[in-house]
C-alpha cells in the first residue's frame, strides 16, 4: 500500500499542472462551464482549492487571549495572488471600457498557484519570442541583397558603438574609483631619510651628501633680514675681495671659508655665485612653491646698470617625489669701462624620498662672460679726484673671458632593515614585542648607496694688446704670439662612489652609523694655445669610512676619513671629526638651544695639474711641488635667543701654494699659521637694532697669505610695524630704516689676474676698503621682501681720501642714480587657512 500511495502521489504531481493548464485554457474560451467540458468537476474543484496552498495568517491569528486563541474564523488566503488579481482586473476593465475581460495568460494566473507563475511566464515569453523571431525572419528574407547588407552594417555599427560606450563607461567608473581613493588618501610623506618632526613642514630643504647620502633638512629662510643681502657672499662672510660687479670673481676675507668645493683652479673664485652637487638645495613641499626675485639699478645709466634675477619653482608630484627648476642671473655694466659681467646659472633637479629608497638627480649649468679691463691704471683717480668712473684709464682695452660649467649628478640609496633578527627574537621569546613597521628606525639596518658626478669646466681667455700699459700688466710676457692671446683650459671630472652604511642599533644610539665606501676619480686637463695644445689624464682609486652617533638630544658627533690607495694622487688623505653639545637653559624658551661645536680636520693633498704644469701665452711653468699639509681646529658658539654667533679657528699650513706679485704659482717653503676669531651679535634696544659682524685674523706670513687683521660689517637700523591686520594679531608691514657699513684695517688687497682667472698677491698699495656704507629702507610686506638702497652714500666720507675699493684697482658702485638699487623678493605658495573663526 505504501508503494502504491507513492506512485499515485507522483502521478498527481505530474498530471495536476497539465490538467490545470487545460482547464484554464478552456475557461478562457468559454468551455467547461457548469461541470461540462474538458475538465471533470472533481479536478476543477481541486484546482480552485489549490490557491490556498500559500497562506499568510492575519496578525490577530497569532495573538492569544485569556482563554486561548481569539474567537472568530481565521481565513487562509493567497494574499499575493489576490493582490495581483485585483490589479489585473482593474487594468482590464480600464482597457475594455468597464467590461471585465481577462487574457488567457491572466486567467491562467487566476487559476494557478503563484509559485507556478514563473513556469507560465517562461511559456509565454518563449511563445512571444518565437512569434517575434518568425516575424523578423520573414521581414529579413523579404529584403534585397543590398538592403540586407545595409541593415547588417547598421546593426554592426550600433553594436560597435554600444561596445565602445560600455568600455568607456567601465574605464570612467574605474577612474572615478581611483580619483575618489586618491582624493580620500592623505598626502603624507613617509620616509626613513628625515625625522618625523620635519615631515609635516610645509617646505623643507637640504643639501646632498655624496659620501653617505645623509640628509639634514631645515626650513628655508624667507625673511627680509636674510634677503637684504642680495649678493650670496655677503650672507656667508663679513666681506670679501671682489671686482665690484655682481657675478664677478670673489675671494672671502675669512680664510676658513676659502676652501674650494670644486677643486678647479680657474673656477674657485666663481663658486659663491653658483651651485654644485654638494651645495645645491633640494626641496620637499606640501604645496607648489615659487620664488620671483629682482635686484637692480633701474634708474641708473644703461651702461652701468646692474640687473640680477632669481626665478625658482618647486613642486611635489607625489609626497615622495619633488621636481624643481632654477634660473639665476647676476651681472651689470660696472663703474669702470669694459667690465660688463654676465653670470647665469640654470639647474634642473629632482629627488625621491621613499620608505626604502632615496634618490637625488640634477643638472647644473653655469656660464660667466666678462669683459676684462685689468683694473684702473692709477688708483689716485679715485683717491684724489671726483671724475666719472668711465673716464678713468683702464689697463686692458680689448680682453675678455668666458667660463662654462656643466654638471650631471646622481645619488641613490637603498635601505635594508634587518627585520629577520627581530622576527627570530619574537619566535624564541613570546614576551618579546616586534614592531613590523617598515619605518621603524630602531632596528639594525643597512644602507647601500651609490653616487656619480660628471662635470666639465672650460675657460677661454682672449686679448689684443698693443699699448705699454697692457704689456707691463703681463710683464711683457708673450710666449707664443706677441700682441694677441687665445688661451683655452678645460677640466673634466668623473667621480663614482659605492658605499654601505650599517646602523647597528638605533638611529639615535651612541654609535648610530658605521660607514665604508670606495670610489674612483678621473680627471683630465687640457691646455690650448695657438701653437701647442696639451692633454693630461689622471685616475685615482680611494677608500673612505665614517661613523656618527648621539647621546639623547644633547650631544652629537661624527668622524670621517679618506685615503687614496692607487693612482695619480696616491698617498693623499683627509681626516675630520665634529662634535656638538646642545643645552636648553632658557626657562621661557625650552626649545631654544645653546650650541657649542668643535671641528678638527687634517689633510695631505697633491697639488693639481694646473699648479704643476701650465702653458699659455702670458704664463707657463713646470713645477715639482710637494704635497700640501693643512690642519685646522675650530670652535663655534650659537645662541639664537640672544642673536649671538661666535667662532674661533687655528690653522697650521705647510707647503701651501700662492700666486706671487708676478702671477707665478709658488710653494711656501716654511710652515705658517692662521688664527681667526669672529662674532656676530645683534643688540635690540626698543626699535633700535645694532647688528654687528666682526672678524679678527692673524697670518704669520703676510707676504704669502695676506689677510686683513680687522674686518667689520655694521648694520644699524630702526625697526617698526607700519601696518597690522584687522584683528591686530599679525604684522602686515614691517619696516627697517638705517645704514649698512663696511670697513677693514689696512692691508695689501689681492689683485685679479684675468689671464689665469685667479687672485694674486700685490705689495704696492694698501687698502682699507672703506669705510663705505649704504642707506636703506627694508620692508617685509606680508610674504614679500622689498628694499631700496642708496649705495655708497658717503663715497669716501668721512675719510680724507676715498677708499671704496673692492680689490686692487677695482671699485664698488658709486653713489647717485647708478647706486640707487631696488630689490624685491616674492615667494608664492598656498598654506592651510585653518578652521573658520566662530
Language-model features: locations:
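Gram-negative bacterial Sec-dependent N-terminal signal peptides
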Residues: 1-46
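Terminal non-domain segments
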Residues: 4, 17-18, 343, 389-393, ...
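Residue-level detector of intrinsically disordered/flexible regions characterized by low predicted structural confidence
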Residues: 5, 9-10, 72, 103, ...
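Hydrophobic alpha-helical elements and their junctions with loops/disorder across both membrane
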Residues: 24-26, 129, 173, 699
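Membrane-proximal, glycine/serine-rich, low-complexity loop/turn segments characteristic
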Residues: 31-406, 416-428, 584-591, 813-817, ...
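Exposed, low-structure sequence patches enriched in small/polar residues
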Residues: 33, 285-287, 292, 395-838
Amino acid at each position: 500500500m505504501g508503494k502504491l500511495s507513492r506512485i499515485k502521489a507522483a502521478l498527481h504531481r505530474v498530471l495536476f499542472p497539465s490538467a490545470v493548464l487545460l482547464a484554464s485554457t478552456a475557461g478562457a474560451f468559454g468551455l467547461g462551464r457548469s461541470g461540462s467540458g474538458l475538465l471533470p468537476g472533481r479536478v476543477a474543484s481541486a484546482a480552485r482549492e489549490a490557491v490556498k496552498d500559500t497562506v499568510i495568517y492575519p496578525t490577530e491569528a497569532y495573538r492569544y487571549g485569556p482563554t486561548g486563541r481569539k474567537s472568530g474564523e481565521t481565513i487562509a488566503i493567497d494574499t499575493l495572488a489576490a493582490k495581483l488579481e485585483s490589479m489585473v482586473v482593474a487594468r482590464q476593465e480600464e482597457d475594455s471600457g468597464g467590461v471585465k475581460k481577462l487574457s488567457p495568460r491572466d486567467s491562467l494566473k487566476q487559476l494557478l498557484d503563484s509559485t507556478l507563475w514563473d513556469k507560465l511566464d517562461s511559456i509565454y515569453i518563449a511563445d512571444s519570442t518565437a512569434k517575434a523571431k518568425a516575424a523578423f525572419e520573414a521581414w529579413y528574407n523579404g529584403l534585397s541583397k543590398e538592403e540586407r547588407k545595409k541593415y547588417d552594417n547598421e546593426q554592426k555599427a550600433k553594436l560597435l558603438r554600444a561596445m565602445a560606450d560600455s568600455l568607456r563607461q567601465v574605464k570612467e567608473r574605474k577612474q572615478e574609483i581611483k580619483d575618489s581613493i586618491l582624493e580620500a588618501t592623505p598626502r603624507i610623506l613617509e620616509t626613513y631619510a628625515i625625522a618625523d618632526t620635519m615631515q609635516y613642514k610645509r617646505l623643507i630643504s637640504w643639501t646632498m651628501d655624496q659620501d653617505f647620502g645623509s640628509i639634514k633638512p631645515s626650513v628655508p629662510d624667507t625673511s627680509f633680514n636674510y634677503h637684504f643681502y642680495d649678493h650670496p657672499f655677503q650672507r656667508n662672510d663679513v666681506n670679501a675681495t671682489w671686482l665690484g660687479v655682481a657675478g664677478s670673481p670673489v675671494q672671502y676675507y675669512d680664510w676658513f671659508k676659502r676652501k674650494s668645493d670644486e677643486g678647479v683652479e680657474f673656477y674657485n673664485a666663481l663658486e659663491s655665485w653658483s651651485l654644485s652637487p654638494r651645495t645645491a638645495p633640494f626641496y620637499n613641499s606640501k604645496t607648489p612653491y615659487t620664488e620671483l626675485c629682482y635686484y637692480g639699478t633701474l634708474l641708473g645709466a644703461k651702461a652701468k646698470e646692474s640687473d640680477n634675477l632669481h626665478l625658482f619653482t618647486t613642486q611635489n608630484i607625489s609626497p615622495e617625489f619633488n621636481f624643481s627648476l632654477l634660473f639665476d642671473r647676476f651681472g651689470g655694466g660696472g663703474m669702470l669701462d669694459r667690465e660688463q659681467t654676465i653670470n647665469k646659472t640654470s639647474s634642473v633637479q629632482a629627488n625621491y624620498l621613499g620608505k626604502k629608497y632615496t634618490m637625488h638627480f640634477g643638472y647644473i649649468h653655469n656660464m660667466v662672460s666678462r669683459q676684462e679691463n685689468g683694473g684702473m691704471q692709477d688708483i689716485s683717480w679715485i683717491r684724489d679726484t671726483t671724475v666719472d668712473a668711465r673716464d678713468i684709464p683702464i689697463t686692458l682695452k680689448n680682453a675678455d673671458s668666458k667660463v662654462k660649467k656643466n654638471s650631471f649628478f646622481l645619488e641613490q640609496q637603498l635601505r635594508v632593515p634587518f627585520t629577520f633578527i627581530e622576527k627570530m627574537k619574537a619566535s624564541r621569546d613570546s614576551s618579546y614585542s616586534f614592531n613590523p613597521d617598515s619605518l621603524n628606525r630602531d632596528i639594525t639596518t643597512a644602507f647601500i648607496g651609490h653616487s656619480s658626478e660628471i662635470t666639465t669646466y672650460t675657460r677661454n681667455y682672449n686679448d689684443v694688446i698693443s699699448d705699454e700699459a697692457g704689456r707691463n700688466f703681463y710683464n711683457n710676457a708673450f710666449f707664443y704670439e706677441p700682441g694677441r692671446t687665445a688661451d683655452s683650459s678645460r677640466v673634466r671630472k668623473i667621480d663614482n662612489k659605492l658605499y654601505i652604511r650599517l646602523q647597528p642599533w638605533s638611529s639615535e644610539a651612541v654609535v648610530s652609523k658605521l660607514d665604508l665606501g670606495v670610489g674612483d676619480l678621473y680627471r683630465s686637463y687640457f691646455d690650448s694655445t695657438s701653437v701647442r695644445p696639451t692633454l693630461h689624464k689622471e685616475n685615482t682609486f680611494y677608500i673612505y669610512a665614517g661613523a656618527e652617533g648621539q647621546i639623547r638630544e644633547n650631544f652629537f658627533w661624527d668622524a670621517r676619513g679618506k685615503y687614496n690607495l692607487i693612482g695619480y694622487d696616491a698617498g693623499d688623505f683627509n681626516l675630520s671629526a665634529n662634535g656638538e653639545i646642545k643645552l636648553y637653559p632658557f626657562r621661557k624658551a625650552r626649545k631654544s638651544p645653546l650650541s657649542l661645536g668643535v671641528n678638527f680636520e687634517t689633510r695631505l693633498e697633491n697639488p693639481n695639474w694646473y699648479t704643476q704644469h701650465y702653458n699659455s701665452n702670458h704664463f707657463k711653468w713646470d713645477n715639482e711641488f710637494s704635497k700640501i699639509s693643512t690642519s685646522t681646529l675650530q670652535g663655534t658658539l650659537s645662541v639664537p635667543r640672544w642673536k649671538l654667533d661666535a667662532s674661533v679657528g687655528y690653522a697650521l699650513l705647510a707647503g701651501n701654494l700662492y700666486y706671487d706679485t708676478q702671477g707665478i704659482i709658488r710653494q711656501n717653503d716654511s710652515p705658517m699659521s692662521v688664527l681667526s676669531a669672529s662674532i656676530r651679535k645683534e643688540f635690540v634696544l626698543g626699535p633700535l637694532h645694532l647688528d654687528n659682524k666682526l672678524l679678527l685674523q692673524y697670518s704669520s706670513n703676510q707676504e704669502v697669505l695676506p689677510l686683513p687683521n680687522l674686518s667689520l660689517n655694521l648694520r644699524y637700523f630702526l625697526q617698526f610695524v607700519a601696518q597690522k591686520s584687522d584683528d591686530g594679531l599679525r604684522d602686515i608691514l614691517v619696516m627697517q630704516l638705517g645704514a649698512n657699513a663696511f670697513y677693514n684695517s689696512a692691508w695689501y688687497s689681492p689683485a685679479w689676474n684675468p689671464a689665469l682667472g685667479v687672485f694674486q698677491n700685490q705689495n704696492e698699495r694698501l687698502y682699507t676698503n672703506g669705510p663705505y656704507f649704504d642707506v636703506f629702507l627694508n620692508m617685509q610686506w606680508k610674504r614679500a621682501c622689498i628694499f631700496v638702497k642708496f649705495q655708497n652714500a658717503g663715497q669716501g666720507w668721512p675719510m680724507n681720501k676715498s677708499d671704496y675699493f673692492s680689490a686692487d684697482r677695482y671699485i664698488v658702485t658709486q653713489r647717485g642714480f647708478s647706486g640707487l638699487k631696488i630689490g624685491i623678493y616674492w615667494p608664492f605658495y598656498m598654506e592651510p587657512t585653518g578652521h573658520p573663526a566662530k
